[in-house]
Amino acid sequence: MLEEKEKFYYSIGVERERRYTIMIRILLACGIGASTGFMAANMRKIAKQQGLDVSVHAVSKSQVMEYADKIDVLLLGPHFSSEVAKYQNQLNDHGVKVTSIDPDDYAALDGESILETALDLVEE
């Protein structure tokens, strides 16, 4: 999986021990993409503060498959946690990891914790 995405080179900043040779591309999805849009902006802000060069975008659930070959991680809004297995099955062939966002982190717009979740998922 990593080799095919080598053109997205980056290495993680000083605060993290992790090292990657590719950009980690994160997609957040909810009903219409509005609430996850705020979260994506918060995550980009945190990533910039930590010196991380990650890509974070938000879309509606209906648009997810359009991004299948352009993402590494899909984070579903907590209200769609029951659909994680469905999306994981659809995205397995694309090498995408899928989970839902913790409801408490989502409610608090805790971009740092959600960014950590995404990076942990990539390392699994």
For the regions a language model picked out, list residue spans one by one.
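Short acidic active-site motifs
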Residues: 60-64, 83
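Short acidic/histidine-rich motifs immediately flanking catalytic phosphotransfer sites
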Residues: 68-73
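Ser/Thr/Gly-rich flexible loops in soluble cytosolic domains mediating phosphotransfer, phosphorylation
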Residues: 25, 98-124
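Conserved active-site segments centered on acidic
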Residues: 24-61
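Short, surface-exposed alpha-helical segments at coil->helix boundaries
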Residues: 37-40, 81-88
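Short, Lys/Arg-enriched N-terminal segments with co-localized hydrophobic residues
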Residues: 3-22
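Short, well-ordered alpha-helices that flank and scaffold nucleotide-derived cofactor binding pockets
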Residues: 41, 45-49, 89, 116, ...
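P-loop/Walker A phosphate-binding loop and immediately adjacent motor/lid segment at beta-alpha junctions
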Residues: 24-26, 31-33, 85-105
